[in-house]
A protein has these predicted regions:
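ADP-ribose/adenylate-binding Rossmann-like module
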Residues: 81, 92-110
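Helix N-cap at the beta1-alpha1 junction of Rossmann-like dinucleotide-binding domains, i.e.
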Residues: 36-38
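Conserved Rossmann-fold cofactor-binding substructure of NAD(P)-dependent oxidoreductases
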Residues: 56-71, 81
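N-terminal Rossmann-like NAD(P) cofactor-binding module of classical short-chain dehydrogenase/reductase
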Residues: 73-77, 100-101
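C-terminal catalytic/substrate-binding lobe primarily of soluble NAD(P)-dependent oxidoreductases
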Residues: 148-408
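N-terminal Rossmann NAD(P)H-binding glycine-rich loop of SDR-like oxidoreductase domains
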Residues: 6-20
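Short beta-strand element of Class I
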Residues: 29-31
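Rossmann-fold NAD(P)-binding glycine/threonine-rich loop
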Residues: 103-126
């Protein structure tokens, strides 16, 4: 049995991970560590399990991190935005010699923490990074197709959408602005390249996609997630892309338009004698408008889907496999928090291979993940009369375009 500390345990993702872990026999203790300590206590009180307690942590105060993680077997880091928080947290955890899981989805800092591999190995630490939905589940489903379904895999395309969460924090909005502002890596024609969200090369990659259980012709946009960088390191591929969106479309459009107008900038401007940071205003404005947009569009409950499309050859013929993880009543919190909790559980079971800083495809057996997450999410679905989770849906598309649903 393992003691787990969940950093950022009060957030949309962290709180789901806390609740999931608290219900697992293999987990002996869960500490909800958050800057909002009172909210952490309230969450622990709602769960009402002797396993769950609360603690204070500040991602930018190393001593508070060290205090919060003391005595843990595994630390799960859910504190965003990761481009500013993950390095000091991972440094503190590695220095303490504790195994680590996170849901980091910022590609730029992912490259930086992968460079901490030698440091983690020297301390005997296993650090599983990007263990959410995308990245996370996507990496493992891509690996599953590559290892077991296709003789040759040419391309992996990752598509995702979600929306309607009960809460969204400032870090989530900041992450979206960040995603639209930085170079977006895409692995095309066997080479890593970069496109820009608002420039013609990025606009050319926009498309629509039919997400099972969610809707048809959902617009999706280039996303700077880590899969495009990490998957080609471990799998011989010619293409890896990542595209996504947030629902409803009107809400995503607001975020996109504010960013396009320059309101994601962090340099203060003078407004009638007051120094105002456009980014801070835009985040606050988005969070205020979100409730109005959800009401206006009739978006009354969360939903989400993450799809992995693997294309290549099987028995000398073109073949495509499509994995979908879809839900009509779960979204970012569950879609990311439950895979993260499963990553922690696999760590506690001793099923994560090796030491160092590694993405999922480097150290997790895909079927270990698929079997465990299917069990956990189906149990969670009972909260919503069985509507919550559609399971891991697998489809095959043959050379004639005929789609067949398969069992995993």
């Amino acid at each position: 049995m393992a003691k787990v500390v969940v950093l950022g345990g009060c957030g949309a993702v962290g709180s789901v991970a806390v609740e999931t872990l608290a219900g697992q026999d293999i987990i002996s203790e869960v500490v909800v560590a958050d800057h909002a300590e009172e909210k952490a206590r309230q969450l622990a009180g709602r769960i009402a399990s002797p396993k769950v307690s609360a603690a204070f942590v500040d991602a930018f105060e190393p001593e508070t991190i060290r205090r919060a993680i003391r005595g843990a077997e595994v630390v799960l880091n859910c504190i965003g935005p990761f481009y500013s928080t993950v390095k000091p947290i991972l440094t503190a955890v590695v220095d303490a010699g504790i195994n680590y899981v996170d849901i980091c989805d910022d590609v730029d800092v992912t490259l930086e923490i992968l460079d901490m591999d030698d440091q983690a190995r020297a301390r005997g630490v296993t650090a599983l990074i990007g263990m959410g939905s995308s990245p996370g589940a996507t990496n493992l489903l891509a690996r599953l197709a590559y290892d077991t379904l296709l003789d040759e895999t040419d391309a992996v395309d990752i598509f995702h959408t979600h929306g309607g969460e009960a809460i969204e924090g400032e870090g989530v909005i900041a992450h979206r602005f960040h995603c639209m502002s930085i170079d977006i890596p895409m692995y095309l024609d066997g080479k890593l390249t970069a496109v820009k969200y608002f420039e013609p090369d990025g606009v050319a990659l926009r498309q629509t996609f039919d997400f099972p259980m969610i809707g048809r012709d959902i617009p999706i946009y280039p996303y700077p997630h880590p899969e495009q960088v990490t998957l080609p390191r471990y799998l011989r591929l010619r293409q890896v892309t990542n595209k996504g969106s947030v629902l409803p479309n009107e809400y995503y459009d607001l975020i996109r338009d504010l960013c396009g107008l320059g309101l994601a900038r962090t340099e203060p401007i003078d407004v009638k004698g007051l120094q105002v940071v456009p980014h801070d205003f835009a985040v606050a404005y988005v969070l205020r408008e979100r409730e109005r947009i959800l009401r206006k569009t009739g978006f009354t409950r969360p939903c989400g889907c993450c799809s992995v499309i693997a294309r290549g050859m099987k028995n000398g013929l073109p073949r495509e496999y499509r994995f979908h993880m879809a839900s009509r009543s779960q979204a970012l919190g569950e879609g990311t928090g439950i895979p993260a909790a499963v990553g922690v559980m696999l760590m506690a079971m001793g099923k994560i291979r090796g030491t160092g800083v590694m993405p999922p495809e480097a150290c997790v057996e895909p079927m270990d993940f698929v079997n465990l997450i299917s069990r956990v999410m189906k149990l969670d679905a009972r909260k919503d009369d069985g509507e919550s989770f559609g399971g891991v849906i697998l489809q095959m598309v043959d050379e004639q375009g005929v789609v067949t649903k398969l069992d995993i």
